[in-house]
């Protein structure tokens, strides 16, 4: 349905975690729900858009595909649900909010997300590439398999929260659940810790990963590698790794969205007489015709010679900015010819310098006012 950026729809950053997504979704969905906006077609459409965005970003697999390839990575996208999906969409949100989960359960901690800044060339960004990165991170201890307990032993149920990971506090008419301070939410107590990880269940290691960079990425884009962040505590899920793209400066091109810019120096004779010159492109070279009287600042646009974007799949243009070069290190003969040209130009009064004449006219008007 929606082709807007899902992060923009929810108003969150690309590194938003699950709790932030849920909080924002709950707020927006309750605001635009059709039951609260009866007969408001725009509110209903906005609600569907919000729900569609949340369904993608709250699913780790769909989110990873979307982060890499945009809407094209979702195999046709996710169909927006109508108001009939309200109860299903909010069941886990309300149960979290009011502590209505049945039976109680111990809390495990998801591992931290990691960020890796990766610099690539403009050519790699345009065509896509695959590269290897090495990251430091917390991984589950091989000896205790992440439990933190010495081999042959196992963690015991926390006596304070009876393994729930939370304790209930009564405040007036309200009953509030809080994380157990004894087991820190794990529901387990390690009395005989693993000697390799000192009971932490995690150890510091370096991991080499292969990262596929899709064609068309731009500065600041991030690629999410699900489960490649730090290991969770007490057997919790691992966090994610966000590889943030940075473009190295290029000796010829500057990128602006999907467009490319470059400066093309041409001789003053070609600028005056016209001609044909060769200009660089990402794919090789192209030839452009230079009309007579071309001035510095003239822009030649080569259609579809820019970059094809990773999200909208539209291809930008190459914009060539002319810089007319003044000759240096003249030979006596060259200097003589130029002096002759200048002398003839002044005698016949012809308009050989349009910008100079325009500037002189403006200056004359300024001083005679």
From Swiss-Prot:
SUPFAM superfamilies: Chaperone J-domain, DnaJ/Hsp40 cysteine-rich domain, HSP40/DnaJ peptide-binding domain
Domain J: 5-70
Cofactor: Zn(2+)
Keywords noted in UniProt: Chaperone, Cytoplasm, DNA replication, Metal-binding, Repeat, Stress response, Zinc, Zinc-finger
A Pfam family matched in the record: DnaJ
GO BP terms: chaperone cofactor-dependent protein refolding; DNA replication; protein refolding; response to heat
Annotated residues for binding of Zn(2+) 1: 141, 144, 194, 197
Domain of life from the UniProt record: Bacteria
GO cellular component, one term: cytoplasm
Zinc-finger ranges (CR-type): 128-206
Family statement: Belongs to the DnaJ family.
Entry remark concerning the domains of this protein: The J domain is necessary and sufficient to stimulate DnaK ATPase activity. Zinc center 1 plays an important role in the autonomous, DnaK-independent chaperone activity of DnaJ. Zinc center 2 is essential for interaction with DnaK and for DnaJ activity.
Protein name (database record): Chaperone protein DnaJ
The encoding gene: dnaJ
């Amino acid at each position: 349905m929606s082709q807007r950026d899902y992060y923009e729809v929810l108003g969150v950053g690309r590194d938003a975690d699950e709790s932030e997504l849920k909080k924002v979704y709950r707020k927006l969905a309750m605001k635009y729900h059709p039951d609260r906006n009866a007969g408001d077609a725009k509110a209903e459409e906005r609600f569907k858009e919000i729900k569609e965005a949340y369904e993608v970003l709250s699913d780790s697999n769909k989110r990873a595909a979307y982060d890499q390839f945009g809407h094209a990575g979702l195999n046709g996208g996710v169909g927006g649900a109508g108001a009939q999906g309200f109860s299903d969409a909010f069941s886990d949100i309300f149960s979290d909010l009011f502590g209505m989960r049945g039976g109680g359960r111990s809390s495990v901690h998801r591992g931290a997300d990691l960020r890796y800044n990766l610099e690539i060339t403009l050519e790699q960004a345009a065509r896509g590439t695959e590269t290897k990165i090495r990251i430091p991170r917390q991984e589950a201890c091989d000896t205790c398999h992440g439990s933190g307990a010495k081999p042959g032993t196992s963690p015991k149920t926390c006596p304070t929260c009876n393994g729930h990971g939370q304790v209930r506090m009564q405040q007036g008419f309200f009953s509030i659940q809080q994380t157990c301070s004894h087991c820190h939410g794990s529901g387990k107590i390690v009395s005989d810790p693993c000697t390799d990880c000192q009971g932490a269940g995690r150890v510091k290691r370096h991991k080499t990963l292969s990262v596929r960079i899709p064609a068309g990425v731009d500065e600041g884009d991030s690629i999410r590698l699900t489960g490649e962040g730090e290991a969770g505590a007490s057997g919790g899920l691992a966090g994610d790794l966000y590889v943030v793209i940075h473009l190295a400066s290029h000796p010829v091109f500057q990128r602006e969205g999907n467009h490319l810019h470059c400066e093309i120096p041409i001789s003053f004779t070609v600028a005056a007489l016209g001609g044909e010159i060769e200009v660089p492109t990402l794919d090789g070279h192209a030839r452009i015709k230079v009309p007579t009287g071309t001035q510095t600042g003239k822009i030649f646009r080569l259609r579809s010679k820019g970059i094809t974007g990773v999200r909208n799949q539209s291809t930008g243009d190459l914009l060539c900015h002319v810089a007319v070069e003044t000759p240096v290190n003249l030979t006596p003969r060259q200097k003589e010819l130029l002096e002759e040209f200048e002398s003839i130009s002044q005698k016949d009064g012809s308009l050989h310098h349009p910008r100079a004449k325009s500037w002189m006219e403006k200056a004359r008007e300024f001083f005679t006012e």
